[in-house]
């Protein structure tokens, strides 16, 4: 098996036709499939979307399982805010509109994808409601736009009898009456109708790309995400307690966004339903059932060799010099955030160099500049909304010419930069706040007198030590043309 012949896959999980064949089903994946976990938390690049894509592929093969999708990408947040229930405060004001959108996705799935329900009359009523209002084929985004155009109201006719049992409408009124009703009452009617549906089917709803519209420091967007989580929990409880319909939501959320929600009491209640994509880079004594990136790599190597049980050792000539501790694997992974995307990207760049046979240290070292440029751009996409002057701060290491510096020297240098000073003044922050934020994003770490270093991505509980020296992440060092080891 040649390193050159390995199929590493697409950079994006969506649209990767082979993903289901070489996906590594890590410990806990089966619990996600069963609905025991309904929130996937992880940094960008840890595989959240890949998990959803593989779950979707498995659902497609199950005749009694169906799914719908919701995404915040290009989502009209402004409209959602306009449709809030002004009678409530905080996250509670947005919960009703989220519930209506999610319910609508479930209903469309029941009507147009599942032919196995025995409650024909109820499903026909549901279908008539969506078709009478011309909203049968709309996405959540399109539904929201229509809600604004219609002042939050829809024709109730097909659902009137279900609404009567919940809010006490006059039962003498015609069941065919056409009237415009607020979407919150429509939600009540739909919930009542769903109680009458008898089905063995399972309905999945996937909510992804919630980071697309998230901006750090925007309290209203934070409230929107909290309200979405509340809506998911409300519906999950309702379906479990009041219906025979199996509802399985799966929400993918970036860890830096999730961390901003920790001051809300509701997040503690979600603990048992959260799966965190925390990958290990261990390679020694690693079992093929461990949550280690090497198992992802081996799965793709084995797939490329048509199941002949080839692995990392079969495609690498580990000729790294003695001063490189841990060999080629350690050299590569120390330049990542311990994310599958980073490791796979580095290997794909190495492959572009077209090594003759096995992967050698020479290939890895010569590919580092291209990888470091890519890694730097990945960081920009993740941190910019949280810390716009991150690049100015990191350029201190370029000025110094080395990957390590003292805290005092770092502060002295960033305070000479006009853009950083302007940001500090406008945000009310001090230099220590910038360092701590860089540490929390693992762009810098701590290093002690014995050369032991600490990064947040290695230990989520790690705290910045303001008495230790600062060290730049090795993945950025080549971008700045800095040495990362001494020969």
Spans of features found by a protein language model:
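Walker A/P-loop-proximal flanking segment of P-loop NTPase domains
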Residues: 1-92, 469-487
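C-terminal leucine-rich, beta-strand-based interaction scaffolds used for sensing/assembly
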Residues: 11-12, 72-73, 318-487
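Flexible secondary-structure boundary motifs
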Residues: 16, 21-25, 304-316, 417
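P-loop NTPase nucleotide-binding core
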Residues: 43, 49-204, 213, 258, ...
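Short, solvent-exposed segments of well-ordered alpha helices
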Residues: 89, 93, 177-180, 197, ...
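Short, hydrophobic/amphipathic alpha-helical patches that form generic packing surfaces
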Residues: 96-111, 295, 299, 345-348, ...
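The catalytic "switch" region of P-loop NTPases
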Residues: 184-206, 210-321, 325
């Amino acid at each position: 098996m040649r390193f050159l012949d390995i199929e590493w896959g697409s950079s994006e999980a969506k649209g990767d036709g082979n993903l289901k064949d070489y996906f590594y089903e890590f410990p806990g994946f089966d619990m996600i499939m069963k609905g025991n976990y309904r929130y996937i938390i992880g940094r960008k690049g840890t595989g959240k979307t890949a998990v959803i894509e593989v779950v979707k592929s498995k659902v497609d093969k199950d005749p009694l399982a169906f799914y719908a999708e919701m995404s915040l990408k290009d989502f009209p947040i402004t409209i959602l805010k306009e449709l809030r229930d002004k009678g409530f405060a905080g996250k509670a004001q947005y919960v009703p509109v989220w519930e209506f959108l999610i319910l609508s996705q479930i209903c469309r799935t029941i009507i147009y994808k599942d032919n196995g329900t025995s409650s024909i009359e109820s499903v026909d009523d549901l279908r008539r409601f969506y078709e009478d209002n011309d909203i049968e084929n709309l996405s959540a985004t399109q539904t929201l736009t229509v809600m604004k155009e219609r002042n939050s109201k829809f024709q109730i006719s097909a659902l009137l009898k279900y609404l009567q049992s919940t809010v006490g409408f006059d039962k003498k009124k015609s069941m065919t009456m056409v009237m415009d009703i607020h979407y919150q009452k429509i939600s009540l009617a739909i919930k009542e109708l769903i109680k009458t549906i008898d089905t063995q089917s399972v309905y999945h709803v996937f909510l992804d790309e919630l980071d697309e519209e998230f901006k750090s420091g925007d309290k209203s967007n934070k409230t929107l995400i909290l309200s979405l989580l509340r809506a998911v929990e409300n519906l999950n409880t309702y379906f479990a307690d009041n219906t025979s319909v199996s509802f399985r939501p799966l929400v993918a959320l970036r860890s830096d966004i999730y961390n901003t929600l920790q001051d809300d009491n509701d997040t503690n209640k979600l603990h048992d339903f959260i799966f965190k994509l925390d990958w290990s880079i261990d390679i020694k004594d690693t079992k093929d059932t461990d949550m280690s990136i090497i198992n992802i790599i081996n799965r793709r190597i084995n797939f490329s060799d048509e199941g002949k049980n080839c692995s990392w050792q079969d495609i690498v000539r580990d000729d790294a010099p003695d001063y490189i501790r841990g060999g080629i694997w350690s050299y590569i992974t120390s330049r990542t955030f311990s994310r599958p995307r980073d490791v796979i990207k580095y290997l794909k760049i190495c492959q572009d160099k077209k090594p003759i046979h096995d992967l050698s240290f020479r290939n890895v070292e010569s590919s580092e500049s291209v990888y470091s440029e890519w890694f730097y751009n990945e960081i920009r996409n993740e941190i910019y909304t949280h810390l716009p002057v991150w690049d100015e701060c990191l350029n201190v290491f370029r000025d110094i010419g080395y990957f390590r510096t003292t805290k005092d020297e770092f502060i002295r240098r960033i305070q000479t930069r006009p853009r950083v000073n302007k940001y500090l003044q406008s945000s009310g922050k001090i230099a220590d706040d910038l360092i701590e934020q860089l540490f929390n994003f693992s762009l810098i770490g701590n290093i002690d007198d014995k050369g032991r270093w600490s990064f947040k991505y290695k230990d989520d509980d790690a705290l910045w030590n303001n008495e230790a020296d600062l060290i730049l992440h090795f993945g950025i060092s080549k971008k700045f043309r800095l040495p990362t080891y001494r020969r």
